Amino acid sequence: MEKKLIFGHKNPDTDSICSALVYADLKTKLGANVEPVRLGVISSETAFVLNYFQVKEPRLVETVANEVNEVILVDHNERQQSANDIEQVQVVEVIDHHRIANFETSNPLYFRAEPVGCTTTILKKMYKENGVDIPKEMAGLMLSAIISDTLLLKSPTCTEQDVAAAHELAEIAGVNLEAYGLDMLKAGADLSDKTIEQLLTLDAKEFQMGNAKVEIAQVNAVDVNDVLARQGELEAAMNASIAEKALDLFVFVVTDILNNDSVAIALGSATQAVEKAYQVTLVDNKAVLKGVVSRKKQIVPVLTDTFQAL
């Protein structure tokens, strides 16, 4: 049986890494020949999770077509967020919870996308559907991904399914949901040792919005001012990315995990889209986005609609 690789998006977050590991566990138990891999560096938050549950990180790959003919995507479907040579392989499965865009295949596939807060909420259901018991460490990974994607069940992306799954998985994993969740988020929000490049690439995604090419990077922080103190350096690096990638807009979002607000730094030729979308005025290239914590639900669709109306 020919091996398939399972991976999440570039600049992987906790859900991307954990979903690849978890789905590989389930598929292997169902008799498939698969390997979880990653398309980028693991974040401090994800490192905390893997260390806590004693799970080895997936292997890093730059390309996939040199290894396999078929791949499985988790936590993404848009081509520009996937492996650089994704066009050279056949996508046979997708498990995701994001919008579907820039995606087509020449062959039929298994495509499962649900409007939930996290990919592992879907994967938990798939264990049950296939009659496979969830191991303690896999429960821990699934729980961690839900905590990460929903900011400990506080994000507007969080659904009743995510809440129910989190409580059940916490019990299987043997952890206190609130205490573990806060420790995990704080580990991810410690940005003191991060370089400017790391801050901008830890959790960054590119999107096509109408005719505009947009990149949105996001970090979680306990004190947003620690990050904003480096605004000059951040803007220099953002402008370099805009020139290199021919971006129309680069938005860097710093989310306060304690107060559930964000500050956005916006650069590029299309910053008026941010002002129009959120009814704000950028002062010194930045604005407070009250109550905004989710890129998926509160930034991407809002900006997409704004660009299409421009």
UniProtKB/Swiss-Prot annotation:
Cofactor entry: Mn(2+)
Q: Which SMART domains match?
A: DHHA2 (SM01131)
How is the cofactor bound, in the record's words?
Answer: Binds 2 manganese ions per subunit.
Q: Where does Mn(2+) 2 bind?
A: D15, D75, H97, D149
Q: What is its main location?
A: cytoplasm
Q: Which GO terms of the cellular component aspect does the record hold?
A: cytoplasm
Question: Which is an annotated GO molecular function term of this record?
Answer: manganese ion binding
EC no. given is: 3.6.1.1
SUPFAM superfamilies noted in UniProt = DHH phosphoesterases
- Where, by residue number, does Mn(2+) 1 bind? H9, D13, D75
Query: HAMAP family given for it?
Result: PPase_C
Family note: Belongs to the PPase class C family.
**What's the protein name?**
Probable manganese-dependent inorganic pyrophosphatase
